[in-house]
Each structure stands twice: as structure tokens, then as C-alpha cells.
Amino acid sequence: MCYSKINNSLRKRFRTFYPVVIDIETAGFNPETDAILEIAIITLKMNEFGLLEKEHLLHFHIQPFKGSRIDKKAIEFHGIDPFSPLRRAISEYEALYSIFNLIHKGIKSNNCTKSIIVAHNAIFDYNFLTAAITRTKIKNNPFHSFVIFDTATLSGLAVGQTVLARACKAIGLTFDNNQAHSALYDTQQTANLFCKIVNRWKTLGGWPPNDTRTIKL
């Protein structure tokens, strides 16, 4: 394999980690007591030019777990009806099983070691995901136990904005506020934002680190 192909692999770019963009919509702010209502993930790939792109998408509506708390303010904020039959919601375990299965395939095909969460204000999604994994007792968690990529932090560095909508617009992406706070839409936009930041850094000469185009400060 030639040097350029090695540097253009996910394994090389992210230190053997397989980045997966995730967004979780919930019925509150406490990951131990408040229900997960919706989850979406997008896996990523490198194209032939070493640019990051979206690959696979999974999106699920989630049944509130037994005894979970539903905060009315959270429901008013995102407009999700937890008990609507039109959502065709599934259990946390079913959703995590499908998500983990897809991620493990991606880890294997890219010769990576672990997956890494990419999310906007990532600690929120990380905490809810971790609580659901503990609650369901599901095995083979593919995610790194503490390393995460937070696009709020990255976009603050890249474009001086930390709010998802503002960061997207600042980097040249459109953002529809009417679709915001849907796990599906927010995951798509977070993935677009992350790819833009990573690819712009490469274009500026920041990757690979010894690229002769690297800008000297």
C-alpha cells in the first residue's frame, strides 16, 4: 500500500479509532432517570482523495424504558410525543444491537480498534448512551470508554461558533431550524460539520502533520 493511501485511511487519520456521528433526543437531562426517545448514527469513510464523507445511516425512535421520567419541558422543546404509535418505536436494546452490529462491521473493514463518538456537545450524548448500555446490559460495546470528538469544541476552534446552527452556517452549510432537534436531522448536520472541519484542516495542510504545505505560524 502506498504512503498516500495509508494516510488517507480512517485508521491512520484517527489513531485506529472509527468515528461515528451520533445524536440522541431525550425526555430530560438526567441520563439515569430520563428516557431516550430518538437516536441516529452516521458512519464515515475516506474517499479516494482522503476526504471524509458520510457513509451509513441508522435512525430509530425509542420506547421510554420502564420507570423512566418524561419532562414536559423537554417534550415542548423538541415536540416528540413519546407514546405516539406513529413513531414505531423500538426498545433501547433493539436499537443498540443494530447500531453496534453496523459499527463492529465498520471497525473490522477499516482495520480499526475502537469506535469513537462524534457529537455536538458530545458529553450529553455520551452520558445517555453509556446509561442505556448499562441499563440494557448489552455486550460488545464498540465505543472508546472516554475519548470523544465534540463538534461544539471543534467548531469553536475552526469557525468561532459553538451552536450547531451557527457553526454550520459559518462553515458554509445550510441549516433548517424547523428540522432541528430531530435526531435524524441533527446527526446529518453534525456529520456534515465534522467532515467540513476535518477536510478543511487537510486542505490547509494540517494533515498529514509533515505535509510540505503545512502553514507555519
From Swiss-Prot:
Q: Which residues form the Exonuclease domain?
A: 20-194
Which residue positions hold the site described Important for substrate binding and specificity? Answer: 29, 77, 124, 146
GO terms for MF: 3'-5' exonuclease activity; magnesium ion binding; nucleic acid binding; RNA exonuclease activity, producing 5'-phosphomonoesters
Q: Name one GO biological process term.
A: tRNA processing
What cofactor requirement does the entry state?
Answer: Mg(2+)
Q: Which residues bind Mg(2+) 1?
A: 23
InterPro entries given in the database record? Exonuclease_RNaseT/DNA_pol3, RNase_T, RNaseH-like_sf, RNaseH_sf
Q: Note the superkingdom of the native organism.
A: Bacteria
List, from the UniProt record, the residues annotated as the active site of this protein: 181 (proton donor/acceptor)
Q: What does this protein do?
A: Trims short 3' overhangs of a variety of RNA species, leaving a one or two nucleotide 3' overhang. Responsible for the end-turnover of tRNA: specifically removes the terminal AMP residue from uncharged tRNA (tRNA-C-C-A). Also appears to be involved in tRNA biosynthesis.
Can you name this protein?
Ribonuclease T
Question: What is the gene called?
Answer: rnt
